[in-house]
Amino acid sequence: MKTIAILGKPNVGKSSLFNRLIKQHLAITSDVSGTTRDVKRACFDISGVEVELLDTGGIDKAEGLFAKVSANSLKAGQEADLVLYMVDGNVVPQDDDIAYFRTIQKAKKPLVLVINKVDNDKIKQQAWDFACFGAEQMYFISVHHNRGLSILLEAIFELLSLAKEQSLSNNLRSQMDNEEIDESLEEFLGILESTPNKSEENIAVGIIGRVNVGKSSLLNALLGKERSVVSEVAGTTIDPVDDEMDIEGKRVRFVDTAGIRRASKIWGIEKFALLRTNAALAQSHIVILVLDASESFVELDEKISSLIPKHALGVIVVLNKWDKKHKEYKEIIKEFKHRFPFLSFAPVMTLSALNGRNIDKLKKEILKVYQRFAYRIPTSALNDVIAQAVAHHHIPSDHGKIVKIYYATQYATHPPQIALVSNRPESLHFSYKRYIINMLREQFDFEGVPILLSVKGKNAKDEENTSAKKESPSKVSHRESKNRRFV
């Protein structure tokens, strides 16, 4: 697959072009210079051929954080098959822009000068001043008004020689259409059953925590490279940044989400970032909650952790900056258990992202938690445990009426979801459900994994009584989410 990188100084419209081409609002855009800080990747289609597009941070001479952003952007340009260097058509050509452009020219790869914000012919006349760059290919566009983009796409198609790939793709598609499929229904179903589900092959891991607890450093340590920009400046990550790696043959995708601040400090582009954080977690299997061991936990840590039951994710708690811990292990764990009783089922790991302490252990733990997250209990074993639980602690009656559990079945995984079939579904107290879940945790290794337990009626009358109170899994109420955390 061919790769295209969009480079240029801050605030020239790189992220807007990125969003326009991929037809999604994936990169956060703003009038604030330097909004994009990490390289974002997405695929889009040009005349039937898929290409990868990279949205990079602005290139400038700033030091510190933005020097790292510039370095990452230039590196992305070196790895791409085509570079679109973007400038602002409303601004006269700048010497540093020319210098950056000519530096990229030395790489001897296809390079296009894209002049953005050319909203009308008057601006286009002025924009001819950019001929001083010495670009072989120069295109005038306006992302905001969707002007000149079709011509730019045609140029990209030719520069990347995509016609050959399009021809190959069309020939393959035609060949497949002409083949006779003589498999029986049974054979076809057999193929489906033996084919692994791609969504289950790839493990999606979200990394959450408040600002500056070391999430980006942790992501870089896991990947073994600087994928996410790290800085002492609080709130460096704005867009969720994702990347993939193999861990013992399993494909794992990490998402480093925006650091979460107090609500009173959330404004502008950070509001969009928080919405995107929730969206990223909605597609994750496991969440790593990063806490700062160099200082006491705060109320905001607890509020952030409330995102976890909402999405019913596998959980790993990471006490980062352990090399600077403010208390001894026993005291910190005691404080953790006091503040986060609803995470009692989660493994807690101490590590230092900066020096690499326990990073390999964390990788192994991710695989273990996912295995539990995807585990299906054999029905016979499940019912044996339920029978033992009932025998050990009888179900309380409902005002003298006997409550029975007939049987149990696990109807879904990711996370484990179990239904109990009862004669009186509404009479099974939440404390008894918690007891059942604790028994399941005791008998089966479900560390780090939520267990969702529901109770259903045995006959139509029971189902009718419960259906009115039942809600869609995607709209779990705050009350139910809270109860699930404690069971």
From Swiss-Prot:
Residues 459-487 are annotated as: Disordered. Gene3D superfamilies: 3.30.300.20, P-loop containing nucleotide triphosphate hydrolases. GO terms for biological process: ribosome biogenesis. Residues 459-480 have a biased composition (Basic and acidic residues). This is GTPase Der. Residues 375-459 form the KH-like domain. Keywords: GTP-binding, Nucleotide-binding, Repeat, Ribosome biogenesis. Belongs to the TRAFAC class TrmE-Era-EngA-EngB-Septin-like GTPase superfamily. EngA (Der) GTPase family. One of its GO terms (molecular function) is ribosome binding. GTP 1 binds at residues 8-15, 55-59, 116-119. InterPro entries: G_ENGA, GTP-bd, GTPase_Der, KH_dom-like, KH_dom-like_a/b, P-loop_NTPase, Small_GTP-bd. GTPase that plays an essential role in the late steps of ribosome biogenesis. It comes from the Bacteria. PROSITE patterns: G_ENGA (PS51712). Residues 2-164, 203-374 form the EngA-type G domain.
